[in-house]
Amino acid sequence: MADLTRRAVLGAAGLGTLGLVAGGWSSSPAFARADKWAQLQRQLTGRLVWSDDPRYVRLAQPRNLRYAALMPKAVALCKSVEDVAAAVRWARDTDTPFAIRGGGHNYAAGSSTTGLIISTRGMARGRLDGATLYAQAGARNRDLAAILPEGDDLYLLPGGNCPNVGVTGLTLGGGIGPNATWAGLTADHLREVTMVTATGSVVTASASVNPDLFWSLRGGAGGNFGVVTDLTYELVEVPVRRATTFIFDFTGVDAVSRAGRAWQEARRNGGRLISGSWFAGRATGGVWCRVRGQVLMGGQAASDVLAPLIAAEPDASEVKTRSWWDAYLWYRTPVSPNNTFWDRSLYAEQDLPGRAFDEITRHLDAFPQPGRAFGGFQLLGWLGGKVNDVPATQTAYVHRSARWILEIMSGWANPTDPSVWPTRVPADIREWVEQFWDLLLPYSNRHSYQNFPDPALKDFARAYYGRNLPRLSQVKRAWDPDDVFTYPQAIPLPSR
């Protein structure tokens, strides 16, 4: 794809961001203009957005509408690190609950509050200097992709495949993505951060400056140590100029199970040069699945890698060799509109045995509300390879022996009356998810991905951080001893 076309596509995808930060501060309700809030506005170069502002819902609503009642008094649209520092100091001094929001896609409303949302949405610039990429905290995947270097030499910051997801939250939780098997995690390419601390001071962290903090910010998840405002990355050179994308669709319990086994075989064939997922669900007509991904090769070599999927007799398929940038854009999947859902994840270190696919497809077939709700599963093959070349304790991201993410997905319709938003999962769907979890546990290492936060985890800190938890707790005590940055699944302070 020509560069102009690539930039046009990415630019069009980013138009919505401009609308969110443009315009002035509308007059707020009288109750919201209390003295303390007026004091905050005077300290900001950005604006406070109140509930009567047309931007409010888009800026304040949680990604997961299970938590739609959790709306803030106001959103601070910060324009600079000084704005962020002022907002943190103000929230602490006034004892106002607050949450940090970049992209706003936290599954469990970790970036939501009834008090003040400190938003970095208005800080979304990126800058390139050779193979070094500088980004503000509000930048999204699409913003950074649009400034990647031009010409014959292709460079990449490996990240997620959702263009509208914030890069800061992605990075702080590790940052898996479709290029991770050959390029590593987003966090593995982080070289320096600027952060506002619990006292409102501004610090930097890198391998040589505040190294314990820097270690923690590469996998310790967002909202635990401070507010990251700026990030510096080192790009990786793309090793190929062409890639082959693929889609294979299957329907029926037997065919879907067969496709899952074929997907594992294809991954073994492709090694770190293949990535993708086996995504299966239950519709009114029965169980279906789609295997979708890319291979960093073309021609007969790609066909050989994909041979197990071709031999599995899909209902429909598309295999196409493209320029690398075309393949990169093809793989990107915008996040769906805000909806009501509950997702759970487990890491697996080995391929699943054949019987597991029979068990999974039968359980999908038993989903209690086909047509009225959604029940699904994803065998996500974005791990192994370069990710696992890094020792588990070298960064806070501990899951360096995993090969797969096993992701349970469920979603249900939103009620028409916003006063009764369903914070609870429907009983039959909850039972189905819990049974699914029990089915998958024996195939997992019992760890979960911290960027897919799950309120149902009984020991979330161990599941997210494993052997790195004690060190993370010590760093938490060093940088936030009063637990100013907290939420239901925040890293705990060490026991006294």
Regions inferred by a protein language model and the residue ranges of each:
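Soluble FAD-dependent oxygen oxidases
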Residues: 2-496
